[in-house]
């Protein structure tokens, strides 16, 4: 027997082999609810990043970053002697993965360090940017996260190149493993777009390539991008700089730009400011054919130490660098803020050309060589632009904004500074999460502001009295629970938006959402507002309760009442301090994306979707930062409390609705019931007595999944057990309280 044959680890290495998802590709991703546990965090559960950041000498750190900008390293020389443009790109590409549709992506978790982002074709050479930063990160240690450092470095880069920035806020905590919940698309090749569009690019086989015109893409002006994606091709941040699928069509490119930037919550003015401002600096890199570039970081050898895209062309760096395959420098001041970009955009006529790598780009007709070389002071080049740049000239709306910025440089500088701040802070949530001395004082509507507390808060005695008044008001347990749930569960852990604070459930657009049952909601709110007014009028010393607090307190009262009906005395924790936002503080268009298209917790779906209802339930639970046990206990409790939209009886597996019992689980797992779908769509089911055929219950996919999915069933069996009633009540109260307080960052 050979030595190789004797080795017990010839193939059987831990984690390899055929997986469950290989066997069952459509298996429900319950594992998404257990991401980023304390087991992956080397800092331990006791580490408090906010406290660590407060001890940071921010000004000293910024001085070190300023020095780094012009400290060119031989192993990766700085273009134009300044790393600023590289670091602006790093920060932009960290924040720029954010999409407003589900709030996921963005720079708030430091995910650019991990796959797939660290190996995206659009992120070529950003591995070098992070390595340039490593000595500074090493020096300041855990006082600043990678997530904060990448954004701060982009800010300092802009300042070092002459722009007055709007401000900077820290508070982004690092994660320690790749996000698994982000849907980047289903394409299996880099730069592919053939799934997100009905007819898009098939992509390339290599991790780095230049995509030229794709004749299969017939309708770039009218195509619709799949939601919630905000990038036109797999591995790009936004758009293809050559044009849609490599078609060098500025007007079609403008459509892609408008669509993708809107999905990152940017309007036309912000879009123009960001593109023009970003392209005021630096250059793109396409010194030679793309086939000179090697594997991305995740496919690299051990000796590469996490660096990728080894370039065999010339020196492989400096003047020989290849990233996008494009070779464009926009301005005569690539390391200094200026208005050159617009002067060149409108001052020249442009003709189509190709980079040394074969990518479509544009060169100024009959122009002198006025653009400096990045590494040879004796050389000059003709002005060049990307197809996406020309979109700002030939799209009528973009052109009007661009010409105004050209004529009013001060407006351009201010618009870019503000848009950059929004780009890099959009996923951080409310201002209460902002840390540091550079936080701007101005309140912005996209931050979803709420008023500060300016009055004494209610105490425990007040809360107890209010709960009695609420329960005597004639409002049902179901109405109180569903209203509190609807108010709190707009929250998204992805971008920290939504939640009960602000009581925006009484404002447009939330008051009119189908899931919120507008007619019922109006009656509940009217009653609660009367209770609020009576209480506040009776107080002395300015004590008040906000409607936001009262909505949550009312839900708590209903839960306590239902638990008492089940034989359990509980007090649901309540922390006053929420305030009521105004309609003027609420951007209707921005809040519209928070509308639930489906909420399995309330057995609601706005319509039938291609995605199974149980998968949408997992998505909702993940955005609410729930674990699998929390998801399970909440669904079971909400069903018996009657919180379904439209008073639907689906999933109400109890003969005593309004009582906080574990009946949902006991009856779902009862083998005396046989379940059958009521239609070929298999979205609703009947449960009949196996012996008599008598109808016992009706349910939906999000009900039956707790008996069907092996992981969720394992949890459901705990709560269905004969000894589980008390545990069920206490676990429900804990999970309910967590949801009610998801947006209470002031309590952390």
Swiss-Prot record:
One of its GO terms (cellular component) is cytosol. SUPFAM superfamilies: Heme-dependent peroxidases. InterPro entries: Catalase_peroxidase, Haem_peroxidase, Haem_peroxidase_sf, Peroxidases_AS, Peroxidases_heam-ligand_BS. The keyword Oxidoreductase applies. Its EC number is 1.11.1.21. One of its GO terms (biological process) is cellular response to hydrogen peroxide. The keyword Heme applies. It catalyses: H2O2 + AH2 = A + 2 H2O; 2 H2O2 = O2 + 2 H2O. Binds 1 heme b (iron(II)-protoporphyrin IX) group per dimer. The active site is at residue 93. GO terms for molecular function: catalase activity; heme binding; metal ion binding. Keywords: Heme, Hydrogen peroxide, Iron, Metal-binding, Oxidoreductase, Peroxidase. Belongs to the peroxidase family. Peroxidase/catalase subfamily. NCBIfam families: cat_per_HPI, PRK15061.1. This is Catalase-peroxidase. It comes from Xanthomonas euvesicatoria pv. vesicatoria (strain 85-10) (Xanthomonas campestris pv. vesicatoria). The gene is katG.
